[in-house]
C-alpha cells in the first residue's frame, strides 16, 4: 500500500470543542498510515452577502492550491458513493498518479462555483444537509474507514 499523502482544505476553524476533538481523533488514526495535511481558509466576512462571501472564500481556496494537488470538492451536488467505492476512489489516486488528492470542504454556505469548476471530481456525503463542521468529521471518518478497507483491517461491517 502506498504511503502517499492527502490534503484537506476547509473553510473555517472548528470552534466547538466536541467537533475539534472528533476531528483530532480521526486525524490521529489516519496519520498512523498516511500523512494528512489540513489547510484552514478564513471564513468570509459575515457583513458580506452570501455570494460575495462564497466568492471571497473561493478565491482564497484557489490561492491555497499547490501544483501537486488534485482538487476534489465535497459538495451537496456531487456524486454520492458508498464507503467501499470511496476506498477504491482513494486507491485509484494513490496508485495511479504522482499528485496528491486534495479534498475541499466549503464553509456554511458551501463552495463557490469557481472552486467546483476546477475540481477533478466532486463528491457528496449524501442527500441530506450537514453543518460544515459535522461534514468535516464525517469525511475524516470515511477516510479512516477507507484506509481500514484498503488494509483489510476489521472496522467496516
Swiss-Prot record:
SUPFAM superfamilies to which the protein is assigned, alphabetical: alpha/beta knot
UniProt-annotated location(s): Cytoplasm
Gene Ontology CC: cytoplasm
Regions that span the bilayer: none
Assembly: Homodimer.
HAMAP family (alphabetical): 23SrRNA_methyltr_H
The protein, known as: Ribosomal RNA large subunit methyltransferase H
Organism from which the protein derives: Lawsonia intracellularis (strain PHE/MN1-00)
Gene name, Swiss-Prot/TrEMBL: rlmH
Amino acid at each position: 500500500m502506498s504511503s502517499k499523502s492527502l490534503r484537506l482544505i476547509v473553510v473555517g476553524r472548528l470552534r466547538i470543542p466536541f467537533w475539534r476533538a472528533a476531528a483530532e481523533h480521526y486525524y490521529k488514526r489516519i496519520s498512523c498510515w498516511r500523512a494528512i495535511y489540513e489547510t484552514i481558509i478564513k471564513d468570509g466576512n459575515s457583513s458580506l452577502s452570501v455570494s460575495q462571501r462564497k466568492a471571497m472564500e473561493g478565491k482564497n481556496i484557489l490561492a491555497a492550491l499547490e501544483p501537486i494537488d488534485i482538487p476534489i470538492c465535497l459538495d451537496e451536488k456531487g456524486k454520492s458513493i458508498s464507503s467501499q467505492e470511496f476506498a477504491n476512489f482513494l486507491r485509484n489516486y494513490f496508485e495511479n498518479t504522482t499528485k496528491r488528492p486534495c479534498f475541499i470542504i466549503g464553509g456554511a454556505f458551501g463552495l463557490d462555483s469557481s472552486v467546483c469548476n476546477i475540481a477533478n471530481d466532486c463528491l457528496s456525503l449524501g442527500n441530506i444537509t450537514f453543518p460544515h463542521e459535522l461534514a468535516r468529521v464525517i469525511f475524516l471518518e470515511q477516510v479512516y474507514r477507507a484506509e481500514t478497507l484498503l488494509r483489510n483491517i476489521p472496522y467496516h461491517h
